[in-house]
């Protein structure tokens, strides 16, 4: 566990941090979040580390509790593509179908990697037949993304791709690099940054995860 640094030592206002702490505690007390944790760093120094609420089994949230990051993983996902670009393996102008031929159907023939990164791919919706119970099966993920139809012309309309974004990037990484996206992000990003409890995909930490109703 990291040692707390005095806010003044890193030019932070301790009173402002106290206000953040009070607001956090109020939101927990008011039931805005079933469980949450908040860590604030400045210049690599931990200045605030608080948690509160309960997991769905009634156990209190602690500094060891793990949370699903949801869309906070998008910057991590994009970073993986940037690594491949730096290594000369892809260009943002590449058609996705250059690296994943089966993707180029149902209106997605002209979708580029850059379109995916900027949410201009034109297929923000996940196929209705693809249910959350299918998500852990990567082969089904790949098939669903290949079959997904566009509802906008690629490159013309900004439309947030909440889920398809990560799935498409994950498969591009797998096809270009050869490693699964789970392995790539672990070996190339998480471990070098000492993020040993940050991972993609199901793992054996389920006893530490999930507040009662909503993911924070």
Regions found by a protein language model. Give the residues of each.
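Short glycine/proline-rich turn/loop motifs
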Residues: 2-5, 57-63, 147-152
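Short, conserved catalytic-motif segment at the N-terminal edge
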Residues: 8-69, 91-94
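Alpha-helical scaffold elements that line and support the substrate/ligand-binding pocket
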Residues: 38-40, 44-45, 68-89, 95, ...
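A glycine-rich, coil/turn loop motif that links secondary-structure elements
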Residues: 102-110, 157-162
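Short helix- or helix-capping micro-motifs
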Residues: 106-129
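Catalytic-site signature segments of enzymes, centered on catalytic residues
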Residues: 126-205
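Single conserved hydrophobic/aromatic residue that forms the stacking wall/gate
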Residues: 207-216
